[in-house]
Design a protein with these regions (language model features):
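Repeat-associated, polar segments at repeat-unit boundaries in modular proteins
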Residues: 50-53
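N-terminal acidic leader/helix
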Residues: 1-32, 55-62
C-alpha cells in the first residue's frame, strides 16, 4: 500500500480503524492459509500500522 494512502487511513475515526484492522487481520490469515507470503507481508504491514495507531489512541473497543 502506498505510504501516503496509509497515512490518510490512519487519520480515520476509531470505529473505522478498528473495522479496517479486523479486515486486514482476516486477509492476513487467509493469505497465511494459502501460503501467500507476498499477501501476508502486505496485510501485516497495514494491520501493524493500524494497530500501532490504535494503541497510541488507547482505543481497542470492537
Amino acid at each position: 500500500m502506498d505510504k501516503e494512502v496509509l497515512e490518510i487511513l490512519l487519520k480515520a475515526n476509531n470505529k473505522y480503524l478498528c473495522e479496517l484492522f479486523q479486515y486486514t487481520n482476516q486477509k492476513y490469515f487467509e493469505c497465511y492459509i494459502d501460503d501467500n507470503k507476498e499477501g501476508m507481508n502486505y496485510y501485516k504491514e497495514i494491520f501493524d500500522s493500524i494497530g500501532e495507531e490504535l494503541r497510541k489512541r488507547n482505543y481497542w473497543s470492537y
